[in-house]
Swiss-Prot record:
Protein name: Agamous-like MADS-box protein AGL8 homolog
Pfam families: K-box (PF01486), SRF-TF (PF00319)
Species for this entry: Sinapis alba (White mustard)
Functional summary from the UniProt entry: Probable transcription factor.
Occurrences of domain MADS-box (ranges): 3-57
Length: 241
């Protein structure tokens, strides 16, 4: 007795539904890959689970290329059928195209982040690895360039500061030199004035006090008249009481 025809309907049990989805999805992806390889056909397969998770397959990982070809074909077909497509329908088509591209880009982004890799074939994984290596190489090159530019800028700032410090040191030394020179001149002027200025002293004699002028030569002295050097009251002879 042969098997009866199984009626297709929604599986009510959540676990059984998930298991069936996983098995059928793998089989569908496998069939898509087989027809692509055996028949040299360009195949694009997009599957969304009940939770909104995306699963896809495309020949040689060219989903965007196949979708663009599909859009061109669809647009050309509509042009042949009739050119009375309204503007709103054009916007709907453009929206669908952009939405498909966004979904593909989001899928690629997740793949680059190391997510949703189970659905990728070996060839797709190798292509993804190559793209990541190229991206890392480009990032490392830009990082090294940025570090070099930063070091060069710091060296320029250091040179400017060094030149500024040298200029300040030069000014300080010049001011110190001028200060020392002025102090030496002041000392010399002070010494010269003390040598040239006459010194007076009083000496006593039998008749009273007389003045004596001391000049540069201390050995030579001249006596002055008492009344010409000192007032009269200071020249009166003292008396012993």
């Amino acid at each position: 007795m042969g098997r009866g025809r199984v009626q297709l309907k929604r599986i009510e049990n959540k676990i059984n539904r998930q298991v069936t989805f996983s098995k059928r999805r793998s089989g569908l992806l496998k069939k898509a890959h087989e027809i692509s390889v055996l028949c040299d056909a360009e195949v694009a397969l997009v599957i969304f689970s009940s939770k909104g998770k995306l699963f896809e397959y495309s020949t040689d990982s060219c989903m965007e290329k196949i979708l663009e070809r599909y859009d061109r074909y669809l647009y050309s077909d509509k042009q042949l059928v009739g050119r009375d497509i309204s503007q709103s329908e054009n916007w709907v088509l453009e929206h669908a195209k952009l939405k498909a591209r966004v979904e593909v880009l989001e899928k690629n982004k997740r793949n680059f982040m190391g997510e949703d890799l189970d659905s990728l074939s070996l060839k797709e994984l190798q292509s993804l690895e190559h793209q990541l290596h190229a991206a890392i190489k480009s990032i490392r090159s830009r990082k090294n360039q940025a570090m070099f530019e930063s070091i060069s800028a710091l060296q320029k700032k250091d040179k400017v500061l060094q030149d500024h410090n040298n200029a300040l040191l030069k000014k300080i030394k010049e001011r110190e030199k001028n200060t020392v020179h002025q102090e030496v001149q002041l000392i010399q002027c002070s010494n010269n004035s003390s040598i040239l200025q006459p010194q007076y002293c009083l000496t006593s004699s039998r008749d009273g006090f007389v003045g004596r002028v001391e000049g540069e030569n201390e050995g030579a002295s001249s006596l002055a008249e008492p009344n010409s050097l000192l007032p009269a009251w200071m020249l009166r002879p003292t008396t012993n009481e």
